[in-house]
């Protein structure tokens, strides 16, 4: 590979990475308006099955927000999360979060249940729910 080709490939890579991060969605964890704020560590504990006082809600496995949420919150990818929940379910130590079709369904379920928590796009937040944490 000559220098000119390498320089072009490097430029394409930089542009691709820059555009990829520029379009990242803002994700927030939400709860019932009466809920107290949670730290990211507390949220991770709920979504990893370590805290059963709250009821975590998931979006569909095929939804891009789901993979993004778990990666940002726990550092784990979708396959790792799925395997972890399969293990917890098999051993009787937990039950995977209930899947809902989209952010509106999550928001509606969270608004109706004081123990439920979920995640949605920041732009979808309204007065029916409370932002518990920003997921960066």
Task: Tell what function each PLM region has.
Residues 24-136:
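Flexible loop/hinge segments at secondary-structure junctions
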Residues 1-11:
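Bacterial N-terminal signal peptides that target proteins for export
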Residues 10-13, 22:
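Cleavable N-terminal signal peptides
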